[in-house]
Amino acid sequence: MSRTAFFISDGTGITAETLGRSLLAQFEGVDLTLVVKPYIDTLEKAHDLAAIIAQTADRDGERPIVIDTIVDQSIRDIIAAAPGFKVDIFSTFLAPLEEELATHSTYTVGRTHAIGRDDVYMHRIDAVHFALDNDDGARTHQYDQADVILVGVSRCGKTPTSLYLALQFGIRAANYPLTEDDLDEDGVLNMPKALAPYRHKLFALTIDPRRLAAIRSERRPNSRYCSMDQCMQELQQAEALFRRYHIPYIDTTRFSIEEISTRMIAETHLTRRFSPR
């Protein structure tokens, strides 16, 4: 089964897309084409979009799914008249909340992104700068300022996880790659000197060797770096290090960056400086 889903908003569309994706992810047997339409904030834009929804229904032979967070009632009415299956997130939840809280909603466009905006912005920028400055073991002298230090072999997901933690939660995440330089004379991977004072901040990532080899092949094909033997050896040594020093770790093979991050936060009890956008 193939369907089209529209995520529509009079703001950035982040809320509609995030909630919509979460809902639609529950239907694994449906092949979905996802369309994001932000800033539908005028009647003209609403009419144009309604026409697109109608064209999509004709083309697919099925009415598209329409998930929106539009505040303006006149714009909502235009979208509602289009031939789509409408999931109005705000109207679904605001009415019962108004009743429970005994007060009326302000129905303000972009309100979710305005709450504490200046403070959130500064935390986000600070955390992103920190993640970039401390990527791949670049500045180990700043580890005392880190909320968490991600460790693992090259290409196991440390950098994207660090940036996601910074962008979504304002967490100052550094990351350190475990390499052959950290082997002792007997070929055993030891705790790197730069990390030893911060063992309480360490969280490790590992990955299936076949997946790691595939990822590395995209970067350096036909090299020792991406060979299965090399990947298996590095991962075995890294996981032995994690166990020896009781460093918590997660296998990233089957998890998205979002899942890796939230699982890590739950396990380490890191403090979020703000909630996701």
Curated annotation (Swiss-Prot):
Enzyme class, broadest EC rank: transferase
GO MF term list: ADP binding; ATP binding; phosphotransferase activity, phosphate group as acceptor; protein serine/threonine kinase activity
Domain of life: Bacteria
Residues reported in the UniProt entry to bind ADP: G152, V153, S154, R155, C156, G157, K158, T159
Pfam families listed in its UniProt record: Kinase-PPPase
EC number(s) from the headed UniProt entry: 2.7.11.33, 2.7.4.28
Assigned keywords, A-Z: Kinase, Nucleotide-binding, Serine/threonine-protein kinase, Transferase
Catalytic activity: [pyruvate, water dikinase] + ADP = [pyruvate, water dikinase]-phosphate + AMP + H(+); [pyruvate, water dikinase]-phosphate + phosphate + H(+) = [pyruvate, water dikinase] + diphosphate
Role of this protein: Bifunctional serine/threonine kinase and phosphorylase involved in the regulation of the phosphoenolpyruvate synthase (PEPS) by catalyzing its phosphorylation/dephosphorylation.
Family: Belongs to the pyruvate, phosphate/water dikinase regulatory protein family. PSRP subfamily.
Protein name: Putative phosphoenolpyruvate synthase regulatory protein
Species annotation: Chromohalobacter salexigens (strain ATCC BAA-138 / DSM 3043 / CIP 106854 / NCIMB 13768 / 1H11)
